[in-house]
Amino acid sequence: MFRQHSHCSYCGHPFEADQAWPRLCAACGNISFVNPLPVSVVLLPVDDGLLTVRRNIEPQIGQLALPGGYINRGESWQQAGARELYEETGIIIQPEDLREFRVKSAPGYNTLVVFGLAQRMRAPDLPPFSPNDETQEIRVLTAPQELAFSTHTETLREYFEVKFNHSAAEARSILQNAVSQ
């Protein structure tokens, strides 16, 4: 049976089955790491809600999630967020308009998720949506609910807590400051 990360990526020598990370190769001395993968997720306020996508790919196909995905080599988290938002929804935003909302390690610590807050859009200004390889539909949520990933659910809840636990003016100020910083 194949075990992922069971051999040195430099010389191919097998690691001990219970060897801790990072792993030092006994044959060549190379040090191997298994680091979390970086992910960029976009919080796009639309009117009084937040944009979500219904996933058309695994994991969690058919479930609602915030738009986002893996950060490619050579991309900033803002560039990745803008790219993923466009790929999944057809919506264009400028990477420099994204502001950090929160950073969270996903359960199991296999991914490190950067949640970026985009500038608010009006629903009539959104481009027409067509289902694609990654997204079945887009939906604007106006209250917290369970999403495909626990980090998305927690972040959605936090977004609405900031929005609803303050006066409308305070919430606008808090969220606008997050976008303008």
Q: What are these model-derived regions, one by one?
A:
Residues 1-41:
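Acidic, metal-coordinating catalytic segment for phosphate/diphosphate chemistry
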Residues 26, 54, 142:
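Residue-level detector of conserved, well-ordered beta-strand and adjacent loop positions
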Residues 34, 60, 107-109:
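Short glycine/serine/proline-enriched coil/turn segments at secondary-structure junctions
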Residues 38-40, 60-62, 94-97, 112:
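A generic structural signal for short beta-strands and their flanking turns/coil linkers
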Residues 41-43, 51-53, 114-117:
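Short, hydrophobic/aromatic-rich beta-strand segments within well-structured domains
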Residues 45-87:
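Conserved Nudix-box catalytic region and its N-terminal flanking loop in Nudix hydrolases
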Residues 71-158:
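Unchanged
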Residues 158-181:
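Charged phosphate-binding loop/patch that engages nucleotide di/tri-phosphates or the phosphate backbone
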